Regions:
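Cofactor-binding beta-sheet edge motifs in enzyme active sites
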Residues: 2-31, 36-287
Length: 287
């Protein structure tokens, strides 16, 4: 069993719980019109979690909401808001219709770190092109369903409609059905911050933005201020111990002896000494 196979059940369970239906597309298959888009569907088969799949970044739920899988973590910068804005912008769905799922290796690919406030700069462009490609394919599907050329269709709030008849429409949720697109993106073969996997779609021109750049309230601020937010230091698992490194006063120094009796008063504490590494672990943290 490879790593991808191991990850697949967790991702499937997550999507099933949220009613999510995955969208994936790539540049390798020609989408001349509706028939080509229809032929790319693979009913009941979930694509693997790899950087060359659009399903690794975007999922459209049955109710029309969107899950955006972002392979970075938010360390307080509020990048989830920016990513949700970018995805909502490209897909033409409301901001509140997008949920950003971050930093879970079972549901997202490795997009590197987010230090130095570079999370949006280095990772946002991938979610942007992924959302743009998902929109393009959904419009192709709508063109087939409505019997109208794709260039005559527009999207408002996740509803695809003709330019002349608003009533002649279909929602993203209705279009996806329970089927997966299973086509590869044009991945550059890199992981981490350099990862880039665009499709055929061109993202919007910034002059057409309606959501990106707007002031949006961060819902995570109040829980952080009132100590209701769980940080990584708050994580507790069964049998967990706490560790601390013992650092030398001079760089490059090597320990030659250790007085382990100095921690005998701490229940369960023990020394970890491996050549130049010295640390201590215990069941509790003594401040």
């Amino acid at each position: 069993m490879n790593q991808i196979t191991k990850l697949r059940p967790s991702r499937r369970a997550l999507l099933k719980t949220g009613g999510a239906l995955v969208v994936s597309i790539g540049a390798a298959v020609p989408f001349d019109f509706a028939r080509a888009a229809e032929d790319s569907l693979v009913a009941g088969i979930q694509p693997p979690l790899t950087p060359d799949r659009l399903s690794s970044y975007i999922a459209v739920n049955a109710d029309g909401t969107v899950s955006a899988f972002f392979g970075k973590i938010d360390m307080g910068q509020g990048i989830a808001v920016a990513i949700a804005q970018m995805v909502a912008e490209e897909l033409d769905v409301p901001f509140k219709a997008v949920k950003v799922v971050m930093g879970d290796t079972a549901t997202s690919v490795n997009q590197g770190g987010a230090s130095g406030a570079t999370g949006v700069q280095n990772g946002g462009k991938q979610l942007r092109v992924a959302a743009a490609e998902a929109r393009r394919i959904l419009i192709d599907l709508a063109a087939e369903k409505l019997g109208v050329p794709a260039e005559r269709l527009s999207v408002n709030g996740g509803i695809v409609h003709t330019d002349t008849e608003m009533a002649k429409s279909v929602s993203y949720g209705e279009l996806i059905g329970g089927r997966y697109f299973n086509v590869t993106l044009a991945w550059n073969g890199k992981i981490g911050n350099p990862l880039y996997a665009p499709g055929k779609a061109q993202p919007k021109n910034p002059k057409d933005y309606k959501i990106v750049g707007q002031p949006i309230k961060r819902e995570d601020v109040a829980p952080r201020v009132f100590a209701q937010f769980n940080f990584c230091t708050d994580v507790k698992v069964l049998g967990m111990v706490h560790g601390r490194m013992i650092r030398p006063t001079i760089a490059g120094a090597m320990p030659v002896s250790v007085d382990e009796s100095s921690i005998k008063g701490i229940p369960g504490a023990r020394v970890v000494w491996n050549q130049g590494f010295l640390g201590v672990v215990a069941a509790v943290v003594e401040i």
